[in-house]
From Swiss-Prot:
Residues 9-242 form the ATP-grasp domain. This is Succinate--CoA ligase [ADP-forming] subunit beta. SUPFAM superfamilies: Glutathione synthetase ATP-binding domain-like, Succinyl-CoA synthetase domains. Pathway: Carbohydrate metabolism; tricarboxylic acid cycle; succinate from succinyl-CoA (ligase route): step 1/1. PROSITE patterns: ATP_GRASP, SUCCINYL_COA_LIG_3. The gene is sucC. It is an enzyme of class 6 (ligase). One of its GO terms (biological process) is tricarboxylic acid cycle. InterPro entries: ATP-grasp, ATP-grasp_succ-CoA_synth-type, ATP_grasp_subdomain_1, Succ-CoA_synthase_bsu_CS, SUCC_ACL_C, Succ_CoA_ligase-like_bsu, Succinyl-CoA_synth-like. The keyword Transferase does not apply. Keywords: ATP-binding, Ligase, Magnesium, Metal-binding, Nucleotide-binding, Tricarboxylic acid cycle. Pfam families: ATP-grasp_2, Ligase_CoA. It comes from Mycobacterium leprae (strain TN).
Length: 393
């Protein structure tokens, strides 16, 4: 789960990473009010979950509240790499002496963690890697030992950070590692990590995280209940949101045939045969991808049907199940009970194809139930064709 910058900064503050918080608004008038309360020049920053905001005109300096209002007006509604700006972060502008780069991420290729650090911050890190690879340090991190101050200092040194900021930078790097581990993140990035101008003899300025990017591991949600508040429900399709609450793998599409399968491979194959059959029936298409995985209990099946039937475009549903550990009779019982649970909400024809473990018993259960909406079809091709035909009528 990618976070907005302001959410990343909330985690920075929680773990003691120095930075400037700012406030969030969804209007130009709100930006003006925040700027007035800050009483100093501000930065008006688009909140979108993608990079390249500055180049796209999504980050602007404003010397006065009136300028903040105008900049906010220009940024709101901006399309940045397909992301429409709906929220802004208004922060006090900071004096900058130098800009650095720092990140922690999963190195999947080498099955370890990776720290990246560079004295060349404030620009796209891909550009640094391509044009000045010697200025970008890539340091493997031992998952057991982690990052203490000595390791953090070494990372900063390898990134060619100046000697006078090593101690302060190391303290910040160690705190960012603490955040990375404690919050079950897969990416923590600061670009730029800045040094402010020195303010007198012996001062090397402050180290501040002026921008932040954090990606949280959605698979760790069970031990991170607080992360639910970061979910952007407004940007999520309501049906996908409902499916997520039931731990269903659901992706909404634009077709007319709802699909429920068990296992990603079978569900994708079902998608293909429905798409092919649809070409023979006026261009009917799959309406979704929904993989119920290994569990097809009545509750799971009811939740799945509730989600699929909630799509007003759906005209028929193809339930394609291969019985393995979860047997066909268990699935059939789940379908019957699910239809009882849903009652009148189940109002579209269901084409069911069962195969595999206990298929005979599963078919018998559905046949005896004799539900008016259920059509039991023996093969996947026949079932796809029937579902497409029903969706067209």
């Amino acid at each position: 789960m990618d976070l907005f910058e302001y959410q990343a900064k909330e985690l920075f503050a929680k773990h003691g990473v120095p930075g400037i918080q700012g406030r969030v608004t969804d209007s130009a008038e709100g930006a003006k009010t925040i700027a007035m309360e800050i009483g100093r020049p501000v930065m008006v920053k688009a909140q979108v979950k993608t990079g390249g905001r500055g180049k796209a005109g999504g980050v602007k300096y404003a010397a006065t509240p009136e300028e903040a209002y105008q900049q906010a007006k220009n940024i709101l509604g901006l399309d940045i790499k397909g992301h429409i700006v709906k929220k802004l972060l208004v922060v006090e502008a900071s004096d900058i002496a130098e800009e650095y780069y720092l990140s922690f991420l999963l190195d999947r290729a080498n099955r370890t963690y990776l720290a990246m650090c560079s004295v060349e911050g404030g620009m796209e890190i891909e550009e640094v890697a391509a044009t000045k690879p010697e200025r970008l340090a890539k340091v493997s991190v031992d998952a057991v030992k982690g990052v203490d101050l000595a390791c953090a200092r070494s990372i900063a040194q390898q990134g060619h950070l100046p000697a006078e900021v090593l101690d302060a930078a190391a303290a910040t790097i160690a705190k960012l590692w603490e955040l990375f581990v404690a919050e079950d993140a897969t990416l923590v990035e600061v670009n730029p990590l800045v040094r402010t101008p020195s303010r007198g003899y012996g001062s090397s300025g402050k180290i501040l995280a002026l921008d932040g990017k954090v990606t949280l591991d959605a698979n760790a949600r069970f031990r991170q209940p607080g992360h639910a508040e970061f979910e952007d429900r407004a940007a999520t399709d309501p049906l996908e949101w409902k499916a997520k609450q039931h731990n269903l793998n659901y992706i909404k599409l634009d077709g007319e045939v709802g699909i429920i399968g068990n296992g990603a491979g079978l569900t994708m194959s079902t998608f293909d045969v429905v798409a092919y059959a649809g070409e023979q029936h006026g261009g009917v298409k799959p309406a979704n991808f929904l993989d119920i995985g290994g569990g097809a209990s009545a509750e799971v099946m009811a939740a799945s049907l509730d989600v699929v039937l909630g799509d007003v475009q759906v005209k028929s549903v193809f339930v394609n199940i291969f019985g393995g550990i979860t047997t066909c009779d268990t699935v059939a019982t789940g379908i019957v009970k699910a239809l009882e649970i849903l009652g009148d909400e189940a109002n579209k024809p269901l084409v069911v194809r069962l195969d595999g473990n206990n298929v005979g018993e599963g078919r018998r259960i559905l046949a005896e139930a004799n539900h008016p909406l259920v059509m039991l079809v023996p093969t996947m091709d026949e079932a796809a064709n029937k579902a497409a035909e029903l969706a067209r009528t």
